[in-house]
Amino acid sequence: MSFDSEVSNWKYSNFFENKNYRFDKKDILKILPKDDIDEAYNVISGWDNYSSTPLRSLNKLSTKLNLNKIFYKDESKRFNLKSFKALGGAYAVEKVSKGNKNITISTATAGNHGRSVAWGSQKLGLKCKIFISEHVSESRAKVMRSFGADVIRVKGNYDNSLNECVKQSEKNNWQIVQDVAWPNYKLVPKLTMAGYSVMMKEISNQITNQKISHVILQAGVGGMAAAMVAGIARYLDHVPKIIVVEPESAACVLESIKAGQIEKISIEKESIMGGMSCGEVSLVPWEILKNSVDYCVTVSDKYI
């Protein structure tokens, strides 16, 4: 079955229009500044084996839906890490290490972020400690170990692994490189988001003769979605409709936008969309997403 025929079978379960929508480029670029976005692209585009990932056209689906064009950004070959996450964690490692070979990098992860941090640490010859919960598969742990990381499994869920990471990092003076923000910890998540914004720079180079009408973004804690919104503010001369998609069982962005404030939700059953099964929006992404998203949509696991 082709990708576009699979997509044509997707159905949404919830749809919400943001009543507080107010896309303001200046406000967005105060949170994730233009200079930070530009620097991320300049650094990452200089890495060995860098190339823009493909923007693929879903011709069958666009014909079926009577739309001009539908594109999807194919991140499956990004630095051979098979995820856009390669842009974020590894870039943050490079920025926070500042050429110091004696520091130890640490992070908590459900998979792809840790893989990026491990890879970024290996590139720079840094020690790396990665904390994972008991729910993370051994195959994912094995990949992170293949990049030289010391993988530490913690009983409980992701929050338990993050708490242990913070505890051990404070005790051992390790540098945490986390993609989730909390009070007094916002710089590194912003660096991670700046890395993700490279995708929007590439898209702006790949679509040069037409305007983008809609951008559909997946969301877990919101970092990638907010980074792409900032990229839109930086690189596009128009504002497309922005739609955030989440698992039905973990719609923390939708519920927060509906409430007008961050709402922590209880996840009764983990979604098969593992990296998106998140119960709370991260602080920095929320500052961007709360007014910049037009619509929120959820999708049930049975349609994935």
Residue ranges, per PLM feature:
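PLP-dependent amino-acid enzyme catalytic core
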Residues: 1-304
